Amino acid sequence: MAGSGVYADIIEGDVFKYYSDGEWKKSSSGKSVAIINPTTRMTQFKVQACTQEEVNKAMETAKKVQKQWAKTPLWKRAELLHKAAAILKEHKAAIADCLVKEIAKPAKDSVTEVVRSGDLVSYCAEEGVRLLGEGKFLVSDSFPGNERTKYCLTSKIPLGVILAIPPFNYPVNLAVSKIGPALIAGNALVLKPPTQGAVACLHMVHCFHLAGFPKGLISCITGKGSEIGDFLTMHPGVNCISFTGGDTGIAISKKAGMVPLQMELGGKDACIVLEDADLDLVASNVIKGGFSYSGQRCTAIKVILVMQSVADTLVEKVNAKVAKLTVGPPEDNSDITPVVSESSANFIEGLVKDAKEKGATFCQEYKREGNLIWPLLLDNVKPDMRIAWEEPFGPILPVIRINSAEEGIHHCNASNFGLQGCVFTRDINKAMLISDAMESGTIQINSAPARGPDHFPFQGLKDSGIGSQGITNSINMMTKIKTTVINLPSPSYTMG
């Protein structure tokens, strides 16, 4: 399905083209980058290895086209976004097929990601019209010592060219979460997709192409991060960077210079379970929060901090549910599918071996076939184990037994991450106090961590990020304030 039908223009031979100047192009490098299917561990797709000169050309065009796009009426911008959203949903099957083959996301979840992405784009259109359609009016005499001789008019104007870098795990959804706000705000956008997920992104970008956006307003540049990564993030034509991924973002933030940054860099999301918690509810949320998409989510539960008095019961309930998880290929909608790469699988295995050497209790036998790792609950994990602190990004979940809520809070806050967390208790007063004490961007009460709905604020503290996402916050972040002051010859008071 990939590269066929309406998508025939985006591929030549067995290599997908990149998108620039409103056209699908082959790179002058003559080189390509292979995309490995996580399930078969064989080359599934190839994409262009773009050059630095091709990056320059995309940036140059984006700068020019953005000036005109900024003068396009808000209603027209919104109209085109709604059209792109409809096309995206119409072709959800082809894009979902790419996700299945590139990142081993279960087929049903892949379709859900595309539909959710269409909804996000439409919401951006609506929210942008509301948000950007209003300005602010200030008068000077509210500040001491001033008469009403100055009228201040403020509005939000675009930043210019946005560089968007989404991660492999939600390449389409986390691309449009940057594209939608950028475009409705009047910006141009250059997309650097992840290698795993690049073809899904190219298919998604073609939907925007079919919607009729101005040529050059959107570019999708594929290639090796080692060759064009730093060149893109340090490019003088970039006016803002929106990045979702791992600790690469820290290096980007140090090199980016004087441009606004929106960064989400992973987490070690803690789940604190008190004695009065509904343990059946906890167990269900642990499965959903810890093992969906094989734990390859920034907002996955990464460590359970459970009170000693209820730990045995909770572990028993979770183990019963783990036993029912299906393991296999994404085409079969298995609960647990292969992790994205061999290097990821090796990293996860290293955490497992460390835990075993240091005495963790294995609730299941550790099993791995290629990139496929069976779900594993590790009980009696201690703070000296790597799994207590590091983000596995896989179906491995540690349980640390605690004797007080304060102990759980301390472990959460001792982490260098601070993305999300959750607390389970029937006492809302305790829940609020614990939420306030946890140094994380979002705390869920009686539910697993989650990104969304997509209009909710989404942010990380500490090494988990810079700034806040969510549709409204992203639109605001991709604009700046412009002020015009009208100076009157004498004070003027309404109806005075």
UniProtKB/Swiss-Prot annotation:
Q: Where along this sequence does the record place binding of substrate?
A: 116, 169-170, 297-299, 451
**What does the record give as the active site?**
264 (proton acceptor), 298 (nucleophile)
* Organism expressing this protein natively: Apium graveolens (Celery)
Give me the residues that bind NADP(+), please. 192, 195, 230, 391
Recount the known activity regulation.
Answer: Competitive inhibition by NADPH, 3-phospho-D-glycerate and ATP.
What is the protein's known function?
Important as a means of generating NADPH for biosynthetic reactions. May be a main source of cytosolic NADPH for mannitol biosynthesis in leaves.
Q: Report the EC number(s), separated by commas if there are several.
A: 1.2.1.9
Instruction: Reply yes or no: does the keyword S-adenosyl-L-methionine apply.
Output: no
| InterPro entries, A to Z | Ald_DH/histidinol_DH (IPR016161), Ald_DH_C (IPR016163), Ald_DH_CS_CYS (IPR016160), Ald_DH_CS_GLU (IPR029510), Ald_DH_N (IPR016162), Aldehyde_DH_dom (IPR015590), ALDH-related_metabolic_enz (IPR051020)
Subcellular localization(s) per the UniProt record: Cytoplasm, Cytosol
Q: List the Gene Ontology MF annotations in alphabetical order.
A: glyceraldehyde-3-phosphate dehydrogenase (NADP+) (non-phosphorylating) activity; lactaldehyde dehydrogenase (NAD+) activity
Q: List the catalytic activities from the record.
A: D-glyceraldehyde 3-phosphate + NADP(+) + H2O = (2R)-3-phosphoglycerate + NADPH + 2 H(+)
Question: Per the record, GO CC terms?
Answer: cytosol
Family of the protein in this entry: Belongs to the aldehyde dehydrogenase family.
Checking Pfam families in the record gives: Aldedh
Name of the protein described by the UniProt record: NADP-dependent glyceraldehyde-3-phosphate dehydrogenase
Q: Which UniProt keywords apply?
A: Cytoplasm, NADP, Oxidoreductase, Stress response
Q: What are the leading ranks of the lineage?
A: Eukaryota, Viridiplantae, Streptophyta, Embryophyta, Tracheophyta
Class of enzymatic activity (EC top level) = oxidoreductase
Expression induction: By salt stress.
Q: Which domain of life is it from?
A: Eukaryota
Positions of the record's site feature: Transition state stabilizer: 169
